Amino acid sequence: MHTRSRTHRQAVALCAALAASLFTIASPVFSENAVLLIGPVTPTEISGFAGTSFTLGMPQGAHGVYGLWSVERDDKPCYIASMTEDVNKYGDDSSAIKNLCGANPTSNEMKVEFGNVEFAQRTFVRALRVCMNNDNTRVKGLQIRGGEIDGNGNVSDLRAKYAESSDSSSSSGKSMLADLNAPIGLRRNCDNWKKWVECPQGRIATAITAHFGPESDPASLTGIALQCRMVSGTKS
């Protein structure tokens, strides 16, 4: 089990060169059994709505997406980042960011990730859905589902896990029974959830495609798709 930084990758974004040098010196390996990401990139459909698209991350690379991070300005989700980690090296992290917020201050951070002590190493995003505001112009919620990679390259979906007791008076769009294995982030004007989009069996997300709508000053995130690759074990 492991704990990733709860401040997320602000440090990675600000100190990328230093972090890269440290990871090169000593990046702990997940296990003795390395795995590979193979084959072509398979994109999912969009959860939410299409717009001007930006790919965040390296779909053909060796990193898997383990979380997403979004920030707003003036109630508009103008910033989105994917959090990724090498599938064989715990701690070899990186972030890909699309920031359309401009120079003005931002607020209202929203983050979903497989980064708590409750999740095993090599747990990556396999499915995602977004929640929209009431006129379907801005993403106001994120939820992810994941899969855990074993030493043979098999990807096992995380089973639903519910707390023993739930608060039936939950607000802001949360279900009475929240799946603890499907991290969720909500803003107060989350109005309606869009469809789940999911990587094909045996695949994990290696990048995301973020869609921004025609709103300006700043533009708002309207949808997200996953870019997926197959996981395979290596021969001894």
Language-model segment annotations:
Residues 30-236:
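Lectin-type carbohydrate-recognition ectodomains
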Residues 2-16:
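Bacterial N-terminal signal peptides that target proteins for export
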Residues 6, 10, 27-28, 164:
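Intrinsically disordered, low-complexity repeat segments enriched in small/polar residues
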Residues 13-25:
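Bacterial N-terminal signal peptides
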